[in-house]
A protein has these predicted regions:
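A short helix->beta-strand "capping" segment at the edge of beta-propeller domains
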Residues: 22-43, 73-79, 212
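Beta-strand-rich domains and repeat architectures in extracellular enzymes and scaffolds
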Residues: 35-67, 82-94, 242-244
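Surface-exposed loop and turn segments in beta-propeller and other repeat-based domains
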Residues: 36-38, 79, 83-86, 162-171, ...
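Beta-rich, blade/repeat-based domains predominating
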Residues: 42-53, 86-97, 126-139, 169-183, ...
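Conserved beta-strand positions in repeat-built beta-propeller and related beta-rich domains
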Residues: 58-62, 100-107, 142-146, 187-191, ...
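Short loop/turn segments that connect beta-strands within beta-propeller blades
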Residues: 72-76, 114-118, 154-157, 199-203, ...
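Blade-loop segments of beta-propeller domains
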Residues: 75-112, 118-130
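Hydrophobic, well-structured mid-protein blocks that either form specific transmembrane helices
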Residues: 110-168
């Protein structure tokens, strides 16, 4: 499909051709408040992120550098790490039960690990690219760089359902890292400083969160894009970071 580029503030959000004709309302843009900043490994090309058991779990990308890691929130210290192999570009990461699931970008493989030991148990094949991954607690939800979100069975890797994400009647492409937060899917949009809050039933964007300027000019030197959302359900805390970012932020949406 033809892709139209629409520049929104400091970020770029890619839209595919509209399926709806006209004057559909676009979702509101929310402001954010930084609650606290934590150190983040500047060598971590963050592709997947979630918070569980009082710790961060992070999947990193780039060929020859991709891995899986468990991280101490307060210090950013890497407590456990598992390289996934030089031939793989790691992507989204999620946990269901005692298993970790990690996507690869173009290898068409989803790796399944034991959560405690990081030992590889098996791999599922899928078509297309792998970008973001989260879970609603039962099923995996996967993005592939388009406007699609796929529900995936964690038992066998089969796709169960697909929705298209839209705002104002236009499909939102480049959906990247994902997080399930209070019944919504939050999604980074590649090459954008915004996060989309998505209704998982309809695919409609309910609101945008604008994170432009969260890094100072000095902090932004040598970094890549915003990517990484984690939710602490017990503490009701939201964390965000980016690829090669020096900080991870706890934020509150206003």
């Amino acid at each position: 499909m033809k892709v139209l580029a629409l520049f929104l503030l400091a970020g770029t959000v890619a839209f595919s051709q509209p399926k709806a004709t006209a004057k559909a309302a676009t979702a509101p843009i929310l402001k954010h408040q930084v609650v606290k900043a934590y150190p983040h490994d500047r060598e971590a090309f963050t592709q997947g992120l979630f918070f569980q058991d009082g710790q961060l779990w992070e999947g990193t990308g780039l060929y020859e550098r991709s891995g899986l890691r468990r991280v101490e929130l307060a210090t950013g210290k890497v407590l456990q790490v598992h390289p996934i192999g030089e031939a793989y570009f790691g992507e989204g990461l999620a946990a269901v039960g005692n298993q970790l699931f990690q996507l690869t970008w173009k290898n068409g493989l989803m790796f399944v690990y034991d959560k405690g030991s990081f030992q590889l148990q098996k791999a599922f094949r899928y078509t297309g690219e792998g970008w973001g991954l989260t879970t609603d607690g039962k099923q995996l939800i996967m993005s592939d760089g388009t406007s699609a979100l796929h529900w995936v069975d964690p038992l066998n890797g089969s796709r169960l359902a697909t929705i298209r994400v839209t705002d104002g009647g236009r499909e939102i492409a480049n959906l990247n890292e994902l997080e399930w937060i209070k019944g919504e899917i939050w999604a980074n949009v590649w090459q954008s400083n915004r996060i989309a809050r998505i209704d998982p039933k309809t695919g409609r964007v309910k609101a945008w969160l604008n994170l432009t300027g969260i890094l100072t000019a000095a902090e932004a030197q040598g970094t890549d894009v915003l990517n990484g959302i984690a939710y602490d359900a017990k503490g009701d805390r939201i964390f965000i970071t980016g690829k090669l970012w020096p900080k991870l932020f706890e934020i509150r949406a206003n």
